[in-house]
Design a protein with these regions (language model features):
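One-carbon transfer enzymes
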Residues: 1-148
Length: 148
């Protein structure tokens, strides 16, 4: 959809056989092109935020932040904590990135109920469905604001 509208898209994927995409290479590319919007997906490291990046970097997190956020809280670890603490609601948060893990201003949150009978895998499935709705919606909202 973006390429059909002449919007340039670049994707830095982590090869399955490597530990990580080179942070230095990604950082150099970002500094060169200074994109209007950077969307993180599964990026489990702290982003070295530069002044030009403020309000341009989005992340999605599998909890209703500020609950279950911070260093080391991702994926199954979040869902395990939700189950262990007998939460009745969980969800996802799309937020702007700042210099702390899972801390920046929220763009939107989507929630779902957690039944006592839900497994960790079941919770993960519910949250993933919400993430698939929330991230595109949040990106649209942010892009509309960029156009103003």
């Amino acid at each position: 959809l973006l390429t059909e509208r002449n919007v340039e898209v670049a994707i830095a994927r982590q090869p399955e056989d490597s530990i990580a995409v080179s942070d230095a290479n990604v950082e150099a590319w970002l500094d060169e092109y200074k994109p209007d919007l950077i969307c993180l997906c599964g990026y489990l490291r702290l982003v070295h935020m530069k002044p030009w990046m403020a309000g341009r970097v989005l992340n999605i997190h599998p909890s209703l932040l500020p609950k279950y956020g911070g260093k080391g809280m991702y994926g199954t670890r979040v869902h395990e904590a939700v189950k262990q603490n007998n939460e009745v609601e969980t969800g996802c948060t799309v937020h702007f990135v700042d210099s702390e893990y899972d801390h920046g201003p929220h763009v939107l949150q989507k929630s779902c109920c957690v039944a006592h009978s839900d497994t960790i895998e079941g919770i993960a499935e519910k949250v993933f469905k919400l993430e698939c709705e929330a991230y595109p919606e949040a990106i649209r909202q942010v892009v509309e604001q960029l156009r103003v």
